């Protein structure tokens, strides 16, 4: 099982120390209700080699072992990594193995990074972090500490496997909780919420939860689905959107800016918008499920299979 005690020790003398009032008990409760495959997934972490490696987190997430793996070792490592499928966010280049994930998350990072306040020496929260790809890119930008939260057990085990292959780097940590379970810490310099808002039944509550984690003046990085329209435009799918049953609100950019200002964010601005392409989200050998092409109208990729506008994403920055 994953041991969270090193993280508790790590934050005990930081601005996150107040979290220790609630977090250990929450994670003990979490361990009692984990997915049936969690023990199997967590055991795979133990199979990862302890070899030293050259690490690159600046322009990719890559580990190159000082002593190359043999053919047999590479085959065995690939087998273990494939047991943690599906790999959704990446890509990773680990010990000579290319994990070609469903999403080219580096595309999103390249769109977001130029607009951010410098991440060097910052304490960062990544909400809905998945397996942690963007967390490692934040570390590559010099972040002091990155904490990701995501309640999905598979993502936690994927993260811990990657961490081990990156030399057990402790600058990034994944905590398997949701934002709604966090006490207001007001301790993070930057908070990321990317690909989360449209899954929330109460988007304004989510924005308030994000704000409660930021230091005064701290930066919010919000990336979410948007729709064309004016300040009064917001799509509420009748049933599914792109085959997803948990999509509730897709606002226009102006509507989203209005929401952020309404809950007290300052200096709200849209810095990027992009239609999701079949190059950015696609099926690979590391994903057995359907992907974007299956979610779009086969005769008109400008629409989802349900007839809604195809996915378009915007990046909004704001300050607490």
From Swiss-Prot:
- Enzyme class per UniProt: transferase
**Pfam families (alphabetical):** Methyltransf_9
Q: Which GO terms describe its molecular function?
A: methyltransferase activity; transferase activity, transferring alkyl or aryl (other than methyl) groups
Task: Tell me a GO biological process for this protein.
Answer: tRNA wobble uridine modification
What EC identifiers does the entry list? 2.5.1.-
**InterPro entries from the entry?**
CmoB (IPR010017), Mo5U34_MeTrfas-like (IPR027555), SAM-dependent_MTases_sf (IPR029063)
Instruction: Give binding positions for carboxy-S-adenosyl-L-methionine.
Output: 89, 103, 108, 128, 150-152, 179-180, 194, 198, 313
Q: Which UniProt keywords apply?
A: Transferase, tRNA processing
Catalysed reactions, as listed in the record: carboxy-S-adenosyl-L-methionine + 5-hydroxyuridine(34) in tRNA = 5-carboxymethoxyuridine(34) in tRNA + S-adenosyl-L-homocysteine + H(+)
The record ties this protein, via NCBIfam families, to: PRK15068.1, tRNA 5-methoxyuridine(34)/uridine 5-oxyacetic acid(34) synthase CmoB
Give the protein family.
Belongs to the class I-like SAM-binding methyltransferase superfamily. CmoB family.
Q: What is known about what this protein does? A: Catalyzes carboxymethyl transfer from carboxy-S-adenosyl-L-methionine (Cx-SAM) to 5-hydroxyuridine (ho5U) to form 5-carboxymethoxyuridine (cmo5U) at position 34 in tRNAs.
Assembly:
Homotetramer.
| Name of the protein in its database record | tRNA U34 carboxymethyltransferase
Species of provenance: Actinobacillus pleuropneumoniae serotype 7 (strain AP76)
